[in-house]
Amino acid sequence: MPKMKTKSGAAKRFLKTANGIKHKHAFKSHILTKMSTKRKRQLRGSSLLHPSDVAKVERMLRLR
């Protein structure tokens, strides 16, 4: 039986760490002039994935 392939789109977007799965925030690529400075500041950096989404992403990354 062949090896299971990782979803390459998911591999580019998520990173497995000791504390969980890390991801970048959405809505931060273009047309940012209408967004407030506070909102853009809150979307900076990365955060951990919500526990309800972890199983789906682990399946895409073939961690499970």
UniProtKB/Swiss-Prot annotation:
Sorted keywords for this record are:
Ribonucleoprotein, Ribosomal protein
Gene3D superfamilies recorded: 4.10.410.60
Stored SUPFAM superfamilies: L35p-like
Q: Which residues form a coiled coil?
A: none
An example Gene Ontology CC term for this record: cytosolic large ribosomal subunit
Task: Give the superkingdom in one word.
Answer: Bacteria
**Annotated PROSITE patterns:** RIBOSOMAL_L35
GO molecular function per UniProt = structural constituent of ribosome
User: One biological process GO term for this chain?
Assistant: translation
- What is stated as this protein's family in its record? Belongs to the bacterial ribosomal protein bL35 family.
- Write down the HAMAP family for this protein, in alphabetical order: Ribosomal_bL35
Q: What is this protein called?
A: Large ribosomal subunit protein bL35
Q: Species name for this entry?
A: Pseudomonas syringae pv. tomato (strain ATCC BAA-871 / DC3000)
